[in-house]
């Protein structure tokens, strides 16, 4: 039987690395905000039952009136006020997760090219083992560097994977991981790192090099190219 799946979508980023005052989730790709591209994909995937969208408190009315309603995003269960950091925003989203939700998927609002295949892999793995993420193997040589700018060690590239979202977890596991992080005042760089601190194994499934996170102007150029390819225009 298919598990009940809720997706938490944090979308509280700034436009700092875009050198813009406009938050990156509202930048346009082919005339439509990045966030809308992401949400429409999740809306269309049968694996996702409902969506909890987490945005800055000041954006809540704007998002409801300009994104949720116009694009008929009927899977959105609620628009939740975000926090100071991404982790705080996801924690606020988790407060709205209910007992019927078996699997919690966490996916960045600025990763608009997630595929149903990736999502299926992550959900299946999480349902089976409790925790899973999408990731891609490192293609470049990876160096660990001292604070003085000199190389400390060359890492074994065969063992290095670059984490992406979606990341999926049994509800109780991710709730416990976030509870522990709050108790310890710990901030990780992704959701899986909080689960790892509980000593729970996290399964890695193949992501995609096109499943990019939009953070820089160059990413927007790539995104336009990916979209044109999907639409058969190149």
Swiss-Prot record:
Gene3D superfamilies: Spore Coat Polysaccharide Biosynthesis Protein SpsA, Chain A
A molecular function GO annotation: 2-C-methyl-D-erythritol 4-phosphate cytidylyltransferase activity
Residues with site note (Positions MEP for the nucleophilic attack): 157, 213
PROSITE patterns hit by this protein: ISPD
Leader peptide range in chain numbering: none
GO biological process: isopentenyl diphosphate biosynthetic process, methylerythritol 4-phosphate pathway
One Pfam family per UniProt: IspD
Recorded metabolic or biological pathway in which this protein acts: Isoprenoid biosynthesis; isopentenyl diphosphate biosynthesis via DXP pathway; isopentenyl diphosphate from 1-deoxy-D-xylulose 5-phosphate: step 2/6
Site (Transition state stabilizer): 17, 24
InterPro entries: IspD, IspD/TarI, IspD/TarI_cytidylyltransf_bact, ISPD_synthase_CS, Nucleotide-diphossugar_trans
Catalysed conversion reaction: 2-C-methyl-D-erythritol 4-phosphate + CTP + H(+) = 4-CDP-2-C-methyl-D-erythritol + diphosphate
Membership in a protein family: Belongs to the IspD/TarI cytidylyltransferase family. IspD subfamily.
HAMAP family named among the record's database cross-references: IspD
Protein name: 2-C-methyl-D-erythritol 4-phosphate cytidylyltransferase
Naturally occurring in which organism (per UniProt): Syntrophus aciditrophicus (strain SB)
